[in-house]
């Protein structure tokens, strides 16, 4: 699948990935959803799946703040789903429909 990103979207995703890599152990970073399928509209968000080595509510809050600033700076709307490695390996998340779609259809950046 070919993903077509506008310049501001590509910059926003690069900014997000760079910011996360500086602060967290990012295991996977994928774009999925309408942007990948070529079904996005001008008002569509950019769906991103992030898998971290460690994930908790404090990290979730920090990442929300990072995304908020990036969305403002680049006039985008990045929407994320975040998974922790432990929850995937030891819990039911590996069978979650959203996780399966992200792994199957998502484009790794």
Predicted segments — roles?
Residues 46-50:
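Short beta-strand->loop micro-motif that forms the acidic, two-metal-ion catalytic signature
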Residues 1-27, 36-42, 52-109:
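Catalytic core of pol beta-like nucleotidyltransferases
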Residues 30:
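His-Asp-centered metal-binding catalytic motifs of divalent-metal-dependent phosphohydrolases/nucleases
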């Amino acid at each position: 699948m070919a993903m077509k990103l506008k310049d501001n979207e590509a910059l926003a995703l690069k900014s997000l990935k760079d910011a996360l890599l500086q602060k967290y152990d990012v295991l996977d970073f994928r774009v999925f959803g309408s942007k990948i399928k070529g079904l996005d509209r001008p008002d569509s968000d950019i769906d991103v799946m992030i898998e971290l080595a460690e994930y908790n509510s404090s990290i979730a809050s920090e990442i929300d703040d990072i995304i908020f600033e990036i969305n403002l700076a680049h006039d985008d709307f990045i929407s994320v789903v975040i998974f922790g490695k432990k929850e995937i390996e030891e819990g039911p998340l590996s069978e979650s429909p959203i996780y399966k779609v992200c792994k199957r259809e998502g484009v790794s950046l």
